């Protein structure tokens, strides 16, 4: 079947505007390590795909999945050691204050939980994000998808978008530390606005490498000041590590660590399972216990062995 036939078939069953990459879409049939192969056998170096963290079809991952599939597939409302073993290993890679975990299937679910934790802890509803970002597909998280709104602002009164920090095309006629202080001050102003409107401030969520925003070069000063403003206002800092985490920046295990700050909540997505539907939330014990005690949260497939 040629590409045109595939595209027509796709439109009939998936809808006319189902997203595809490239002017001439690529028909990928196989992956191995860093390589992808199309239907004609052509090999592509995969420098884009953000999901298979340790490479396509890694033999250790494939073997682990096959072994578990032939042993047990059940939800987490039974006792099982695997979820505990993994969660303990995961939390050990973070700062000591991030000591508890909830496992999910996707980054969207993880960010949903993070928002609920932040709002429950603070009593406010207001969430701050950047003005060109993406954090997932559910109704609540889509309100943060400012990269898909023409003016970079969410239609929800509970979300305020601040200019993402960028020295290449700065939002202010400033340079150096003064520029980064000006960007950080936008967070402070958004917090004050939430309080003045009676909405209350709950937290801020950033991808620490600002991947959706274009990977700008951001100094530690900016994030340190932002987190200071967030904590001074009683809010929480959510680090969306779906794309930045698990050592991808090369220097640190987690993207936010580059800035010398500690997150209150960290959200993880499918790279955690090398592309398979495994995600999670790692958080301070007080935040996670508050969430557990206030809501009957469970996830049939989140962390299932």
Regions found by a protein language model. Name each.
Residues 1-305:
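Conserved N-terminal phosphate-binding loop of PLP-dependent enzymes in the Aspartate aminotransferase
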